[in-house]
A protein has these predicted regions:
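Well-ordered beta-sheet/strand-loop patches within structured domains
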Residues: 8, 19, 23-29, 34-390
Length: 390
């Protein structure tokens, strides 16, 4: 671009000179007319200010969210301020100089953008919404809050900013959230289903993911590793429009199904597939707790189990003919396990049986006198032997 080195100049009082000339003409006076000039110093050229005013990269035409209209982009100019100042210093006052600069022109013009604005569906996903009526209400409300959001090229989209505070004052109802590993009542419970559905749509649209965290436990309304939890105002889900054109997020509701579509402008026929792999699992165990409010031996499950696991996801981009262009690691999601808790009615203690009393020993009976022994019979006399006969 061109600049002229400032030079000193002279100024005169034009009104005073005009009056003097008029007087000389009307009086036909031919005397010399005095004209006094004043030297004015040339204003220094502030090239740093010029760089701030016109410098910068070229900018494409964009969508004005306030007016709903397409606005023209701008030509970008970048130059070395120090080198330009040296050229000016070496030049003569009033000399015109050529300052070396890099000029970048917008690749998307206003007329071109108006023809293709939000023409194509870049990515979409539908998830089924279940649960209490209050949870379903929260999902519908969050989906409505983000619907119609426009993100210009290079800009970020914050889910929390779009949804707003998930409080009672903001109109949300009590759903369920996980705090400390337990499901507890919480205002806005259920809004994570919308952020998760948006996340999967953004992956399929091949958008850049700036900030995303998985749930404590795996959810079943999106594929494993494709969920995105939020907790206003601390934990956010953020995506970036890394395309050359504005994108618009639009949500739909039908028969308890929430659909998120991302509209934009496709410049080729490529598409995305997400694949995942479970790399480890964490089993759960059963914990029994004795309680007094159940009949002895009766069981009641107070916490149902969840298997923990770690899953890795990849983003695979294919051309229009189905040929793989790229396969990049997307994220690793670690889901906790949760034990099964069973309450069991406490057994009532049984009293110890009383032992039978030990009987007193019976007294020994008085001994009877022993009978006298029978006397031995007296021996009979032996007869004399008879003499033999003659």
């Amino acid at each position: 671009f061109y600049v002229t080195k400032p030079a000193d100049g002279r100024t005169i009082d034009r009104d005073k000179l005009a009056r003097a000339l008029h007087q000389a003409v009307t009086t036909r006076c031919l005397d010399p007319i005095e004209c006094v000039s004043t030297v004015t110093q040339g204003k220094a050229l502030d090239l740093a200010a010029v760089e701030r005013e016109i410098g910068g990269e070229g900018k494409n035409a964009s969508y004005d969210r306030a007016t709903g209209q397409v606005v023209e982009g701008r030509v970008g100019v970048t130059f070395d301020v120090a080198a330009a100042e040296k050229l000016v210093e070496q030049a003569q006052p009033g000399q015109e100089l050529v300052i070396p600069a890099r000029i970048t022109y917008p690749t998307v013009t206003k007329a071109g953008l108006e023809k293709v604005l939000f023409r194509d569906v870049l990515g979409q996903y539908t998830s089924y919404v279940s649960g209490t009526s209050d949870r379903i209400f929260n999902v519908r409300k969050a989906a409505g809050n983000i619907s119609g959001s426009v993100v210009n090229s290079g800009e970020n989209f914050s889910y929390n900013d779009a949804v707003g505070p998930t409080t009672k004052e903001a109109g949300f109802k009590i759903g369920t959230a996980y705090v400390g590993g337990k499901a507890v009542p919480s205002y806005g419970g259920g809004v994570c289903q919308v952020s998760s559905t948006l996340y999967y749509s953004a992956l399929l649209a091949n958008l850049k993911i700036v900030s995303r965290a998985c749930h404590m436990y795996a959810q079943d309304y999106v594929p494993s590793g494709c969920d995105a939890t939020v907790f206003w105002p601390y934990l956010d889900f953020v995506i970036q429009n890394n395309t050359d054109y504005p994108i618009k997020i639009v949500t739909y509701w039908y028969n308890n199904n929430v659909t998120v579509k991302i509209f934009g402008t496709k410049t080729d026929s490529s598409f995305v597939k997400i694949t995942s792999k479970t790399v480890s699992t964490t089993p759960w165990k059963t914990i029994y707790k004795e309680v007094d409010n159940l009949a002895p031996g009766v069981e009641r499950v107070t916490q149902y189990p969840i298997t923990g696991f770690t899953v890795q996801t990849w983003r695979n981009v294919y051309d229009g003919n189905g040929n793989l262009i790229s396969s990049n690691f997307e994220a690793e999601s670690n889901y906790d396990s949760r034990d099964k808790i069973v309450e069991v009615g406490k057994q009532k203690p049984q009293p110890d049986p009383k032992p039978d009393p030990t009987p007193e020993p019976a007294p020994d009976p008085d001994p009877e006198p022993a009978p006298d022994p029978d006397p031995e019979p007296a021996p009979e006399p032996t007869p004399d032997p008879e003499e033999p006969g003659n």
